[in-house]
Amino acid sequence: MSARAWVAFGCMSALWGIPYLFIKLAVDDGVPPAFVAWSRVVLAAVVLLALAWRAGSLGPLRGKGRWLAAYAFLEISIPFPMIAFGEQHVASSLAAIIIASVPLFIALLAIRFDQSERATGRRLVGLFVGLGGVVALVGIDVGGRGDELLGAGAIVLAAMGYAAGPMIFKRHLGELDPRATMGGSLAIAALFLTPFALLDPPHAVPTGDGLIAIFVLGIFCTAIAFVIFSGLLMEVGAGRAAVITYINPVVAVGLGVAVLGERPGAGAIAGLLLILAGSWLSTDGRLPPGLAGALERVRARRRAPSHTTGTALVQDP
């Protein structure tokens, strides 16, 4: 990858690893979950729609209203408030680990709805391993504590929404400018979320922590992150960009420990390892093209003979 792509990759690993910290800060400051989600969505929609309007790419959205609405509902309107609600009851690091199960649900849905996906033995093993990680995470770390179990369940529902949304995007919205698609989806999601935000508004003006958290979530973690990610996809492709999925929970857990003083238990660590292993296996256990290519070049060097005074030697690089 180019230096610019590496910078974008680093930015995305951070920008999609930190939302759990800032969601936790916002809800701990007394901002209701629906209002956190609504505020984040409105801020991001304004930024992305402005960029799409400037690029003249809003026109093709005509006729795509029902697919935009379906995508907005599954990818934004369900996950954003569910994660915020869940983080009222569970640690930010636990929320991030549960969201790491998204590739598992994508693979599970693809077997049923994507004819190009086959239920191979490796994929099924990955699904069982990863879903076992979710069970271990919730069962050991949360146990039978009612509020925490409810919060973890809400975040699992968010992960399912994150998994279903891309299928609609791939089939019906993939040919459009992503700034227009995401901006339009965020605007529709804002309409979905407005009644819930009005029914449960903040009882007091949020403090500096709450306001900063909402600003960072909307502008940086949603709008700017999506623009950077779109550029990264165009340069390196989806395969390499997908590595971010494996880094985000590590960033989120690290921030939860360092900033919030969270201490992930044995169930959280075991669940994270099982979920990441299951995600890798359920996506056919392929390394990202960039890493796979680099490893293949190293192997080729090791296999290549070096002729020195008529004797073939295998030299380590």
Language-model features: locations:
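Helix-helix packing/entry segments at the starts of transmembrane helices
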Residues: S39, I76, A95-S101, P166-L191, ...
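Juxtamembrane helix-entry segments on the extracytoplasmic side of multipass membrane proteins
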Residues: M1-A5, D29-W38, P60-R66, L124, ...
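Glycine-/small-residue-enriched transmembrane alpha-helix faces in small-molecule transporters
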Residues: M1-S39, F85, G144-R171, L191, ...
